[in-house]
């Protein structure tokens, strides 16, 4: 019996050992082996010019994600998955005459990715002659091809293509659709202009066939005031791609009550960043735009640029347009900000804009690329910075690094700032800037530090021709036209060119030569800012013995001077004053020679 028990114990131990060895062997056999990633997409997609939504099947044995490589291809809600599935994307209408191609890419890792091409047909020339008609009570169900079948503004904008015209009846229009690619916050709604169309306001509210636009009689307002006390970050966003000879036209519109965020996040469209903290009225990104007979007024920003922000290589012309009463509560450039773009202004008024930072009026600055600003026959008045620091420069105009700015026939009056109450020019080593004043009047401006009229710093080139800078005040000296050193103290520096000009009481002829026996008194020789003819306000030259009336640059020399600029400034600009009066036979300085 004892032997049986002994052998039983031995047998049991052996069985346990075998079981343990078997389990260990099983663990080895069942060791995890990663799958080789496999991902496959459907074929390339051909899309008509009108765009649309598309679904693409995907085969994958591992988790995947998908991305769009073009801003006109917008992904749907599904951007990832765990295995076999599908995703959708929407293609925007192709509002150009050219075929375009983009890609959608799905990937497991960077090494395991698949792409499909999305090829979209172009619009045809006959598509470009369409006229849309919009009323406040228009319906998205209407075709919008007549006043009697008017549609909504959003419907017309979304369906129009390059070369179309959109006629808008009087009334107030509020955006309801989010900017493409945005997060869809309530404040992301905007009127997006994504094609080179003409958007024309000023028609009667009850317009019928044959109606004529008159913006003064029929205000057409694009307002950022939303329900619930909210405001759109941008009332208008121009995202239209540049096309040969094509430009956006905005005419006869009032753009108001946008409110930018204090958060500097952005969306990228058309190769440009659309910051929600800039451009409460209008933001233009890498587009070609003409703005005529418009008002950009009473927009606000919790950070920068409340009025109009122009960025990323845009080309914008403003004519007969008012930029007024826009306010930055915690930033710079309240009226207009030109960043790495080209801006032209003619017969415009920039009035009553305010910034807590620098520049109440026209701000030109990019940290990395040239910005070009050309202002003709315009008045910049009553703009201000808070002026609490000398660095709060440029009440009306502040041009910074890499900038080139030209003012011709302009009146700069009643502005307030830190240094450079009216105009400031700033540069840095390797980032020089340049400004030229031709036939301008700079008066009645105030600096709480240095340079009541005009201040320029080292690393800048300031050229002054046929211009009156007088009657300005500065708390720390340099009332009128002054260069400052690195300590920002007033100096006797004169600009690179000071020709046929007045600085304070001193009258200059050609080449900085002081005219002996001549003196200028702004109190008796300059009139107040007033309507003296023409579309903008000016200051008259007063008194028969006023040297600025007779010692200015001759007409022939002014015409020749314009040919030296790039681009050239023609005699239709240099040969007339701000009110439109010919300078021929008159050798008078300043913006108004009447």
Which stretches of residues belong to each language-model region?
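Surface-exposed binding patches on compact interaction domains or structured appendages
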Residues: 38, 59-88
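Predominantly extracellular beta-rich ligand-binding scaffolds that present long acidic/polar faces
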Residues: 165, 176-196, 208-215, 290, ...
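Extracellular beta-strand-rich solenoid/capping regions of secreted or surface-exposed proteins
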Residues: 154, 159-162, 176-198, 207-251, ...
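C-terminal accessory segments
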Residues: 229-237, 494-495, 507, 511-594
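Solvent-exposed, low-complexity, repeat-rich "mucin-like" stalks and linkers
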Residues: 25-29, 38-67
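A short beta-strand micro-motif common to beta-rich folds, especially ectodomain repeats
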Residues: 98-110
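Right-handed parallel beta-helix/beta-solenoid
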Residues: 123-155, 170-174, 528-531
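Bacterial Sec-dependent N-terminal signal peptides
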Residues: 14-44, 112-117, 121-128
């Amino acid at each position: 019996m004892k032997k049986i028990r002994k052998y039983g114990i031995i047998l049991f131990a052996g069985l346990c050992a075998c079981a343990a060895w078997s389990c260990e062997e099983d663990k080895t056999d069942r060791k995890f082996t990663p799958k080789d990633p496999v991902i496959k997409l459907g074929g390339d997609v051909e899309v008509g010019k009108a765009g649309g939504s598309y679904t693409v099947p995907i085969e994958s044995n591992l988790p995947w994600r998908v991305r769009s490589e073009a801003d006109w291809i917008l992904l749907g809600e599904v951007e990832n998955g765990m295995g076999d599935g599908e995703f959708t994307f929407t293609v925007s209408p192709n509002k150009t005459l050219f075929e375009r191609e983009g890609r959608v890419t799905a990937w497991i890792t960077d090494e395991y990715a698949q792409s499909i091409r999305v090829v979209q047909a172009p619009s045809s020339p006959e598509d470009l002659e369409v006229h849309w008609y919009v009323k406040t009570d228009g319906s998205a169900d209407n075709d919008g091809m007549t006043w009697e079948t008017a549609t909504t503004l959003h419907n017309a904008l979304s369906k129009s293509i390059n070369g179309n015209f959109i006629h808008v009846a009087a009334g107030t229009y509020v955006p309801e659709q989010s900017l493409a690619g945005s997060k869809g916050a309530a404040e992301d709604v905007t009127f997006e202009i994504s094609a080179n169309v003409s958007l024309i306001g000023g028609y009667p509210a009850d317009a019928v066939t044959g109606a004529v636009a008159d913006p003064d009689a029929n205000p057409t307002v694009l307002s950022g005031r939303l329900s619930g006390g909210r405001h759109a970050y941008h009332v208008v966003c121009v995202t239209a791609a540049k096309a040969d000879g094509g430009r956006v036209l905005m005419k006869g519109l009032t753009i108001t009550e946008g409110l930018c965020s204090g958060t500097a996040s952005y969306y990228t469209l058309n190769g440009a960043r659309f910051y929600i903290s800039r451009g409460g009225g209008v933001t233009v990104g890498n587009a070609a735009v003409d703005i005529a007979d418009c008002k950009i007024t009473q927009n606000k920003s919790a950070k920068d640029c409340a009025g109009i922000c122009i960025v990323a290589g845009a080309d914008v012309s403003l004519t007969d347009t008012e930029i007024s009463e826009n306010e930055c509560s915690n930033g710079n450039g309240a009226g207009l900000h030109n960043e790495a773009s080209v801006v032209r202004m003619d017969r415009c008024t920039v009035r009553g804009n305010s910034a807590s930072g620098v520049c109440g009026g026209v701000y030109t600055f990019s940290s990395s690329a040239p910005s070009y600003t050309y202002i003709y026959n315009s008045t910049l008045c009553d703009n201000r910075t808070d002026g609490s620091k000398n660095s709060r420069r440029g009440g009306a105009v502040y041009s910074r690094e890499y900038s080139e700015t030209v003012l011709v026939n302009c009146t700069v009056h009643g502005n307030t700032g830190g240094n450079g109450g009216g105009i400031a020019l700033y540069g840095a080593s390797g980032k020089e800037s340049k400004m030229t004043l031709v036939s301008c009047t700079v008066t009645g401006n105030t600096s709480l530090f240095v340079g009541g009229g005009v201040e320029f710093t080292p690393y800048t080139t300031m050229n002054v021709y046929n211009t009156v800078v007088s009657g300005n005040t500065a708390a720390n000296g340099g009332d009128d036209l002054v260069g400052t050193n690195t300590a920002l103290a007033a100096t006797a520096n004169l600009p690179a060119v000071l020709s046929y000009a007045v600085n304070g009481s001193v009258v200059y002829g050609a080449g900085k030569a002081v005219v002996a026996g001549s003196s200028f008194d702004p109190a008796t020789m300059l009139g107040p800012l007033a309507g003296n003819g023409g579309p903008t306000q000016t200051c008259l030259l007063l008194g028969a013995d006023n040297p600025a009336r007779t010692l200015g640059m001759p007409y022939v020399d002014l015409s020749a001077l314009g040919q030296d600029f790039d681009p050239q400034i023609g005699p239709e600009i240099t040969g007339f004053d701000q009110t439109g009066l010919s300078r021929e036979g008159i050798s008078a300085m300043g913006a108004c020679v009447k």
